[in-house]
């Protein structure tokens, strides 16, 4: 006979296991993604990966300055880079590196480079360098066009939610633990992919 637990207890058990795995990874110094995304600095957590000799590369090496100077995604090169707060930033030109070195905070992607729509749900996850938006002179990354479209159904509301959860929960947290928590204990306004798609379709119909 299969023993069934109440929903709240099942969630607690799942969360406990997720946190246990995260703690084990920390203790062993393993889990490459966790290590890359959680520098011991004020930038923690960040959407970064290990690549070649660099253990923590922001946005898989995208040139963060190019979004501001060229208005588009441009891949940086490993030969032109800067380290800031324990994170490596790559650039497509020496000129862009110089701009970053002079004023790094100006060019940092918001929410650690994670998908802004995910952060609105308290989930630091995803973020594709080629899907972005510039809002009030700041860089926001999204985990694909569907996420960007969902966010832009109500940019003001969703930006406020993202800023709230980033400030109250995500900033300074361990990305894997925070992600696991909010994948189980979802925020009141949580929407799945299908619900977001319907919301986007309705918004487009209303505009047409």
Give short role names for the model-derived ranges.
Residues 1-14:
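N-terminal secretory signal peptides that target proteins for export/translocation
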Residues 4-5, 18, 37:
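Absolute N-terminal positional cue centered near the fourth residue
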Residues 32-85, 105-208:
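Intrinsically disordered, low-complexity terminal tails and linkers in eukaryotic proteins, enriched
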Residues 81-99:
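Beta-strand cores of secreted/periplasmic/IMS beta-sandwich domains, seen most often
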């Amino acid at each position: 006979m299969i023993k069934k637990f109440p929903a709240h207890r099942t969630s607690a058990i799942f969360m406990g296991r997720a946190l246990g795995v995260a703690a084990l990874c920390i203790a062993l110094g393993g889990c490459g993604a966790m290590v890359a995304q959680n520098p011991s600095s004020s930038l923690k957590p960040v959407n970064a990966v290990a690549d070649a000799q660099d253990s923590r590369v922001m946005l898989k090496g995208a040139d963060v300055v190019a979004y501001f100077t060229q208005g588009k995604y441009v891949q940086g090169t490993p030969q032109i880079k800067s380290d800031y707060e324990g994170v490596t930033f790559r650039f497509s030109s020496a000129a862009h590196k110089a701009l970053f070195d002079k004023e790094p905070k100006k060019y940092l992607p918001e929410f650690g480079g994670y998908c802004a729509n995910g952060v609105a749900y308290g989930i630091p996850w995803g973020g594709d360098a080629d899907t972005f938006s510039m809002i009030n002179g700041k860089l926001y990354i999204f985990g694909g066009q569907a996420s960007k479209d969902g966010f832009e159904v109500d940019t003001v509301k969703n930006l406020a939610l993202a800023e709230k959860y980033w400030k109250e929960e995500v900033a300074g947290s361990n990305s894997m633990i925070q992600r696991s928590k909010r994948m189980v204990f979802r925020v009141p306004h949580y929407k799945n992919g299908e619900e977001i798609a319907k919301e986007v379709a309705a918004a487009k119909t209303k505009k047409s």
